[in-house]
Amino acid sequence: MAADGQCSLPASWRPVTLTHVEYPAGDLSGHLLAYLSLSPVFVIVGFVTLIIFKRELHTISFLGGLALNEGVNWLIKNVIQEPRPCGGPHTAVGTKYGMPSSHSQFMWFFSVYSFLFLYLRMHQTNNARFLDLLWRHVLSLGLLAAAFLVSYSRVYLLYHTWSQVLYGGIAGGLMAVAWFIFTQEVLTPLFPRIAAWPISEFFLIRDTSLIPNVLWFEYTVTRAEARNRQRKLGTKLQ
């Protein structure tokens, strides 16, 4: 709790711009789009959670690609130095430059890379069930729709122009393709060696690149281990 004397001290206050999104008062669509505009933050939180609990090399590589993509966006913005639309009506933004949109570039990188992963990386077996294929198609469409809606939200909320989100999407898509190829051709062959490092073993870092369907593999292994332990427990109780 602040002391009484501290309340009168002059100070320059700054917001945390990472999660600060403004929308027109009373605009329901703008309110919803403002929350949707926070999707990159939700994605990052999801990645950190996955890495903490799964510790899988490909997930770490994916997050590294997103970080590199953000670095490229920052570099392009500071080289082009194109201002945001309408004279910058928002006071709390990370940078005054808007070309290209970092939100658009982030979401299109995430969506395009996930799309390639679903159809090229996971499509290693020819006996995929109908529901698996349907889930893959629905998820891909959902990812692409999310990328478009986030891009649209940045224009609607006057953070960017259409050209800024368009070029951001193009940059993110190209970066996703390049990083996917780099991961598949350069990093993936190194994953078994990296997973065998002492530091990787200490932190339980694992490589699942040779397993076509990790979800099904984890389900079957967990079920088999649970049944095995249940049988052993039943034997001890007899």
UniProtKB/Swiss-Prot annotation:
CDD domains: PAP2_dolichyldiphosphatase. Pathway: Protein modification; protein glycosylation. It holds the Pfam family PAP2. One of its GO terms (molecular function) is dolichyldiphosphatase activity. One of its GO terms (cellular component) is endoplasmic reticulum membrane. SUPFAM superfamilies: Acid phosphatase/Vanadium-dependent haloperoxidase. One of its GO terms (biological process) is protein N-linked glycosylation. The keyword DNA-binding does not apply. It comes from the Eukaryota. The chain crosses the membrane at residues 33-53, 100-120, 130-150, 162-182. Keywords: Endoplasmic reticulum, Hydrolase, Membrane, Transmembrane, Transmembrane helix. InterPro entries: Dolichyldiphosphatase_PAP2, P_Acid_Pase_2/haloperoxi_sf, P_Acid_Pase_2/haloperoxidase. It is a multi-pass membrane protein. Its EC number is 3.6.1.43. It is an enzyme of class 3 (hydrolase). It is found in: Endoplasmic reticulum membrane. Belongs to the dolichyldiphosphatase family. PANTHER family: DOLICHYLDIPHOSPHATASE 1, PALMITOYL-PROTEIN THIOESTERASE/DOLICHYLDIPHOSPHATASE 1. This is Dolichyldiphosphatase 1.
